[in-house]
Amino acid sequence: MGKQATERRLADTEARAITKMIRTSPYKLNLVAESIRGKTAERALAELTFSKRRMADTVKKTLQSAIANAENNHQLDVDQLIVSEAYVGKAMVLKRWRARARGRVGKILKPFSNLTIVVRERGETA
């Protein structure tokens, strides 16, 4: 029903990396993604290296993949890259049950998330 979602086309100065099915809630993952948005790639990697959050390693791997894509696939200058977009999407939710007292059950939700990081080359501003 409705229109099929189309993926956004990247500009010549952009590169992207996507990680799917990350076993954490989108809220927790977005806290880490939010912290690197708009920063230089070098600064973002440094922040993720020393972050105490569990998802920082996953976000760091995705950012490194985006940087490698920019360098190898798009021939962009790594020193000029900034994190233009870092957004999180909701994936599936595993539903589990836990036996409780008097024959009842408690619902356990195990959410998964998708992460997309887009880096772009910083433009020269005069």
From Swiss-Prot:
CDD domains: Ribosomal_L22. It comes from the Bacteria. The keyword Manganese does not apply. SUPFAM superfamilies: Ribosomal protein L22. Coiled coil: none annotated. NCBIfam families: rplV_bact. Belongs to the universal ribosomal protein uL22 family. HAMAP family: Ribosomal_uL22_B. This is Large ribosomal subunit protein uL22. The gene is rplV.
